[in-house]
Swiss-Prot record:
Function as written in the Swiss-Prot or TrEMBL entry: Protein that plays a role in the inhibition of canonical Wnt signaling pathway. May be involved in neuronal migration during development of the cerebral neocortex. Involved in the control of ciliogenesis and ciliary length.
Protein name: Doublecortin domain-containing protein 2
Tissue expression pattern: Expressed in hair cells of the inner ear.
CDD domains assigned to the protein according to its UniProt record, in alphabetical order: DCX2_DCDC2
Segments of skewed composition (Basic and acidic residues): 353-365
MF (Gene Ontology): kinesin binding
Residues with Phosphoserine modification: 270
Ranges of biased composition (kind: Polar residues): 252-272, 455-475
GO biological process, one term: positive regulation of smoothened signaling pathway
InterPro entries per UniProt: DCDC2_DCX_dom2, Doublecortin_dom, Doublecortin_dom_sf
Domain Doublecortin residues, every copy: 17-100, 139-221
Keywords of this entry: Cell projection, Cilium biogenesis/degradation, Cytoplasm, Cytoskeleton, Neurogenesis, Phosphoprotein, Repeat
Length: 475
């Protein structure tokens, strides 16, 4: 009755254990779950084999099983409890680590949130606004070489931190300006005051760089710029040289020039200033009117009554005192403009042209006369031969031969007159040139090509020639 019945033992379930196994000495291995089935894992060696495949330790096969806290070694399968934690190791000794805390996420404790809302406390501390704080801009100065009034001023930017080191400032000035004496040792103001530290440098001011020589007192300020433009407010950005005073673009400059041009002119002929629209222009005209009125009064006083003009000096100058005025006389040469000079007729050029034309015409007539005489003589000599060879045609050709031979009375008279006029000139030239020139001319005449024959005939001869030509054509 007290012992278990065979039926109950037959119906009992097999024992199954589940354990978590860690690696020996591995702080990052979170453990591996291993299930021990009673039928499959019947001995401790089979359990070690199952743990070796599940853990996959780098040291190889698992040979020992330890408890995680004390490192107690387990030798039998019955000592393993279900749901327990164990450490699997090889031949090495047990390594103490906090295996149970490996892989657990630590929860941070929640801080107590203060739900109370404090009221706003208005502070009475006076703090300057951001835009009122001075910016740490570099100090800008303009440098001039000692005794140099020609070269322009050089602009140098000095950081604020470098102003405390005066030697460093002088080194920067030396790199910017080259002196004949060498490095820059001192800085002076334009008035000649020595600058001993960087705290004395003012932004936008001009300084003279001096080497080992002495400071040369020269009018630097008068030659470079106007004194009114030297000073600048502290903290203003000096990006360029001071502006020029009296520029053309200043307001009211046009009206001021116009008022100057009207000085000394009469009231009727003086041009009036241009009228412009706008309130500003009406206000700007007021000072110009005052200037015109003041200057016009002075100008009326300076103009003399004898209407000599405004360009005559009102008083005698000291340079001209005692000087005698030179009067003009007959020998004084006066230059007159071209349009006021009397017109002159030049006859010399026309006379010269006439004489040259007459000489050329005489030469042409003499040449033509000589050639005509030569050709007429040759034709007269050839005429008897033609008459002997052809007796029938002698009468027909008698009229042309007579014209060329000079048998006509009118033709003969004209030729005789021309030869009589030109014969003296030809004789004089022949005597002067001599026998050699005569031979040269004869040779040149023989080499010259024949010129066209010139014959002078009367109207009656022309009619006779035409009738002879007509009869010969009919025959």
């Amino acid at each position: 009755m007290n012992g278990p019945s065979p039926r109950s033992s037959h119906l009992s379930q097999p024992v199954v254990k589940s354990v978590l196994v860690y690696r020996n000495g591995d702080p990052f291995f979170a453990g591996r779950r291993v299930v021990i089935h009673e039928k499959k894992v019947s001995s401790f060696d089979i359990f070690l084999k199952e743990v070796t495949g599940g853990v996959q330790a780098p040291f190889g096969a698992v040979r020992n099983i330890y408890t995680p806290r004390t490192g107690h070694r387990i030798r039998k399968l019955d000592q393993i409890e279900s749901g327990g934690n164990y450490v699997a190791g090889g031949q090495e000794a047990f390594k103490k680590l906090n295996y149970l805390d490996i892989g657990e996420i630590k929860k941070r404790p929640m801080e107590a949130v203060n739900t109370e809302v404090k009221p706003v406390i208005h502070s009475k501390i006076n703090v300057s606004a951001r835009f009122r704080k001075a910016l740490h801009e570099p100090c800008t100065i303009f440098l001039i070489a000692n005794g140099d009034l020609i070269s322009p001023a050089s602009r140098l930017l000095i950081p604020r931190k470098a102003l405390n080191q005066w030697d460093h400032v002088l080194q920067m000035v030396t790199e910017k300006i080259t002196l004949r004496s060498g490095a820059v040792h001192r800085l002076y103001t334009l008035e000649g005051k020595l600058v001993e530290s960087g705290a004395e440098l003012e932004n936008g001011q001009f300084y003279v760089a001096v080497g080992r020589d002495k400071f040369k007192r020269l009018p630097y300020s008068e030659l470079l710029f106007d004194k009114s433009a030297m000073r600048r407010p502290y903290g203003q950005k000096a990006s360029s040289l001071p502006p020029m005073v009296g520029s053309r673009k200043s307001k009211g400059s046009g009206n001021y020039r116009q008022s100057k041009s009207t000085i000394g002119s009469s009231d009727n002929s003086s041009p009036q200033p241009l009228k412009r629209k706008g309130k500003k222009d009406s206000n700007s005209e007021k000072p110009t009117k005052v200037k015109q009125s003041v200057k016009s009064k002075n100008s009326h006083q300076a103009i003399p009554d004898n209407d000599e003009g405004i360009f005559k000096a009102g008083a005698e100058r000291s340079e001209t005192r005692g000087a005698a005025e030179v009067q003009e006389d007959e020998d004084t040469q006066v230059e007159v403009p071209v349009d006021q000079r009397p017109a002159e007729i030049v006859d010399e050029e026309e006379d010269g042209e006439k004489t040259s034309k007459d000489a050329n015409q005489k030469d042409d007539f003499s040449a033509m006369n000589g050639e005509a005489e030569d050709r007429a003589g040759s034709k007269v000599a050839d005429a008897p031969e033609e008459e002997e060879g052809i007796p029938d045609q002698g009468e027909k050709k008698a009229s042309p031969s007579r014209v060329n031979g000079g048998t006509d009375e009118e033709n003969g008279e004209e030729l005789d007159q021309v030869t009589e006029e030109l014969q003296p000139t030809v004789d004089e030239k022949g005597k002067a040139e001599g026998d050699n020139s005569a031979q040269d001319e004869a040779g040149l005449d023989a080499q010259r090509p024949p010129r066209p024959e010139v014959t002078v005939t009367s109207p009656q001869e022309n009619e006779g020639n035409e009738s002879n030509k007509a009869s010969s054509a009919v025959a």
